Amino acid sequence: MAKINFFAFGGQDERGKNCFVLEINNDVFIFNVGSLTPTTAVLGVKKIIPDFSWIQENQARIKGIFIGNPVTENIGSLEFLFHTVGFFPIYTSTIGAVVIKTKIHENKLNIPHDELEIHELKPLETVKIGHHNITPFKVSSSIPSSFGFALHTDDGYIVYVDDFIVLNDKNIAFENQLNQIIPQVANKTLLLITGVGLVGRNTGFTTPKHKSLEQLNRIIASAKGRVFAACYDSNAYSVMTLAQIARMQNRPFVIYSHSFVHLFNAIVRQKLFNNTHLNTISIEEINNSTNAIVVLTAPPDKLYAKLFKIGTNEDERVRYRKTDSFIFMIPRIAGYEELEAQILDDVARNEVSYYNLGREILSINASDEDMKFLVTSLKPKYIIPTSGLYRDFINFTMVMKQAGVEQSQVLIPFNGEVLAINHKQIDNKKRELKLNPKCVDSAGLQEIGASIMFERDQMSEAGVVTIIIYYDSKKSEFLNEITYSFLGVSLDSNNQVKLKTKMEELIRKQINDIKDFTTIKRRLGKDTSKELKVSIKRAVMNLFTKMTAKAPLILSTIISI
């Protein structure tokens, strides 16, 4: 009989940072090591990554990392895992291996070849890893040759799928092998772990609403000049559709992303796309072309930065022309609405025709009927929805009821909560891991906490005020000089002068209150210094709130000389 634990380091009640752990007896399998790109409200934070402490403590039991759909949300933290913990065998598809190796090369990680162990699995070929047999199978997702995994245990199968749609097209790049794996595991599936996708947000099947060929072909056929199309690098389906149209309309084709060029070349090498008669040009030739289809693609944070640079004529390779057309193919994401509007404003300011297809074309994720098909075919005893917000999980549960699934069968753990299944039954004993996710900024890895994120939010909304006070440790006295800086604080010059005058009065009062104490002690002690800085911060914050109704971040510093 099997003892099974499932828990998440990320991906539960959030979209991104997917990292899930499956313990089967003494074997540990990790699915995804992703990252989360926060909205612009979190100033200076490039990405948020999982806490790897548990992995470090249990690394001897870890049999491998499984990557079915190699997108940023699933592989964005691999480099940090390598640096902080070490290397583990990675099991993925041939395409997944290319994406992972490209990321490693991009990040300039000096990893010896004998330490980086990537196993390219063949679909429907069972392999024994640790003490368990695992069968990968192809699913139709946004990246060609994406995998799901079926793990065999003494109590039945555990089926893991990131994203999928039910698709019966003859496109081998997005082949669907659900019909082959279902007979093997149907009625024997103990647990289905699946991404929540569009379940609860889109009734029916996702197909054919994910297809963009007809709309794109019509737009591009009427375009007078070059066509720029922006999409995430996880959307290989759309990039390949654009390449197909370039071939059909005899237009030059270029992908403005060195990393995605590697992926596209791998897709061609694997004979997943026929590039015969496709006129590809280099990135350097974009401005020389008059009618090229230019794909602008990158992970979310980098893509928006790239689009901003192009829109403001700061990009070194691309300049918009009045004859150009721009197609925005990015799905709307909460927190990015302002960015989207600004990018489209920049495009319009350059007198470029634009089309926003982000709301018209569905992402390649399971909708209600896709998920109902999978669940009714597998008949799992338990289901764990992943990679979504809590409301998504509630909607998922309601849709599953329509498929005849009892509410008690749908298990919704949050990050760190351990779900235990012993001898085919849920163990109701509560257990939780304490997690401390990390954020990555320009200085590297940082601890993350509510206070840190609040301060970054303050900086983005109202700016920063720095105050520097100087203390002569030899004479045990404060100098008269006080240095102020207003960074990102929107105030006119008159108000700044008034504020500085009031601030100086407040600060000198704070200093005078402790002068006698420091004279007696003959030095500025650590506790006194901290007390003074906190007191100044509080007083200046109150002053700002009263005079300006703003609440910038106040940073007070005492320098001993």
UniProtKB/Swiss-Prot annotation:
Q: Which domain of life is it from?
A: Bacteria
Question: Could you confirm whether the keyword Transferase appears in this record?
Answer: no
GO MF terms listed in the record are: metal ion binding; RNA binding
Write down a Pfam family by its short name: RNase_J_C
What keywords sit in the KW lines?
Cell membrane, Membrane, Transmembrane, Transmembrane helix
TM stretches of this protein: 29-49, 80-100
Question: What is the first-listed, main subcellular location in coarse terms?
Answer: membrane
Q: According to its UniProt record, where is this protein located? A: Cell membrane
* Record's signal peptide: none
Task: From the record, give the cysteines joined by S-S bonds.
Answer: none
Its membrane topology is listed as: Multi-pass membrane protein
Task: Please indicate if the UniProt record lists Transmembrane as a keyword.
Answer: yes
Write out the GO cellular component annotations. Answer: plasma membrane
In terms of Gene3D superfamilies, this protein maps to: 3.10.20.580, Metallo-hydrolase/oxidoreductase (3.40.50.10710), Ribonuclease Z/Hydroxyacylglutathione hydrolase-like (3.60.15.10)
Q: What is the protein name stated in its UniProt record? A: Uncharacterized protein MG423 homolog
Organism, scientific name = Mycoplasma pneumoniae (strain ATCC 29342 / M129 / Subtype 1) (Mycoplasmoides pneumoniae)
